[in-house]
Amino acid sequence: MTSILVSRFLLAALVLQYATIDAVNYCNLPCRGDRFHVGCGESAFAQECGESPETRDLLKEHTDEILSKINDVRDHVAKGSWGLPMAARMKVVVWDEELARLATRHTKGCLAETHACRNTERFSFPGQLNFEYTDDKLPQTKELIDAAIKKGHLQKHNISREIIESYRDNGPDGNVEELALALSDRVTAVGCGLTTWQDGAKARALLTCNFSSQTLGVDLSTKSGIVLDEKCIERMNV
C-alpha cells in the first residue's frame, strides 16, 4: 500500500512539473542585459545545425547515469577526498524537467556558447555546461554521456583547496569548470538535452546540462560541524 501511495505521489509531482513548464511564458521573464530567452519563441533548429539535425530523447537510464555520476563525485568531496576538507553542505542533486527542456532548446541552436538567458521562475541564474563531440560517426547516447562525464571527472587532477577557496562569480581559475559546477553546494538540480547533426563529412553532437545555480563554490568550513544532506549520508553508508 505504501509503495502505491509513493508511486502516485511521484506521478502527481511529475504531472505538476510538466504543467508548470507549459504554463510559463519565457518571453516575459526578466533577463540580464536584455538577452533573449532560450525558451522564448519557436523551438526550431538553427542554421548552424547543418544536415539532418535530431534531438535525442534522454531515457531514464541516461538521466540515472548522469545523476549517479554527479552525486558520486559530490559524495567524494563530502567525505574529504582529493585532498579537500569535508564539505559543510552537500545536497543530493535531482533531475529537473524544466532545466532539461531548456537545455534541449539550447542544443537545437547547435552552438555551445551563446548569451541566451535560461532563467526560470524557480531558478534565477542557472549554470550551464556544454560538451561538443565531433567524429566520423556518432556513438550511442550512453557513450556520448560517458565521454562528457569522463572529461569533467579528469579535472579532479587540476582541483585544489586553493582553487576552491578562490572561486569567483565568473568561474574558478584553472581547468576545472565542469567539475566545479557539479560540486557547487548551491546546486540542487540538473537537466540535460542532446542534439546531433551532420556537418559535411563529420557527425557532431552537443550535450548541454543546465544546473539550478551558476554560482561556483563549495563551503569548506567545518567550524560548525559537517552538514550533509540525509540522502548523501545514506549513500556514504552504503
From Swiss-Prot:
Tell me the superkingdom of the source.
Eukaryota
Signal peptide span = 1-23
- Every SCP domain range: 67-211
Q: What is its main location?
A: secreted
Q: Give a short account of what the protein does.
A: Inhibits platelet aggregation induced by all agonists tested (ADP, arachidonic acid, the thromboxane A2 analog U46619, thrombin, and snake venom snaclecs (TMVA that activates platelet through GPIB, and stejnulxin that specifically acts through GPVI (GP6))). May act by competing with fibrinogen for binding to glycoprotein IIb/IIIa (ITGA2B/ITGB3).
Task: Please tell me which stretches of this chain the record labels as motif Cell attachment site.
Answer: 32-34
Instruction: Look up keyword Secreted and say if it applies.
Output: yes
Which GO MF terms are attached to this record? toxin activity
Q: Record's Gene Ontology CC terms?
A: extracellular region
What family is this protein classified in? Belongs to the CRISP family.
Name-wise, this protein is Tabinhibitin 5
